[in-house]
Regions:
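Cell wall/extracellular polymer interaction/catalysis modules
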Residues: 1-99, 113-133, 138-141
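A conserved hydrophobic position in a structured secondary element of the catalytic/binding core
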Residues: 108-109
Length: 141
């Protein structure tokens, strides 16, 4: 199988304020539930614009926050294919918030970290080590 590599990246699952106030879905903004999601992503394009991990391989469980108060409520769960991608926050600088970057996706804060992460995914694909990606989300309390 090869050597395992473990890396940790500063990221967020917090949707942007704009999506909290005006969600894309009638039942509320998506917030990824903590847990392990195996094989749910493949390399693709986020909104057709740049390389990202896109949800194609399995369902993800989310919370739906529908009260429009910009505070995450971890109550109403839904599981399925929601287009939860892993993408960057800013293109060229560290971001202190998600601005309008996220409707519930996972965003890596540092563009340099993101570039490294995507390159590791590309290398895995190129070396025949697999084209599906898993992740484990631990929520800070």
């Amino acid at each position: 199988l090869g050597d395992w590599l473990e890396e940790v990246y500063e990221c967020t699952t917090d949707p942007s304020t704009s999506y909290h106030r005006v969600p894309l879905h009638a039942t509320g903004v998506a917030i990824v539930k903590e847990g392990q999601y195996r094989g749910v992503w493949k390399l693709g394009k986020h909104r057709g614009l740049y390389k990202a991990l896109v949800q194609t391989g399995g369902p993800i469980t989310i919370y739906r926050d529908s009260n429009l108060d910009d505070i995450a409520d971890y109550v109403d769960e839904d599981t399925g294919y929601f287009g939860i991608n892993l993408h960057r926050a800013g293109r060229s600088s560290l971001m202190d918030n998600t601005k309008d970057f996220s409707a519930g996706c996972i965003c890596i804060r540092s563009p340099l970290d993101y570039a490294r992460f995507i390159r590791l995914c590309e290398l895995q694909d190129e070396n025949g080590k697999g084209s599906k990606y898993s992740f484990t989300l631990v929520r800070e309390k």
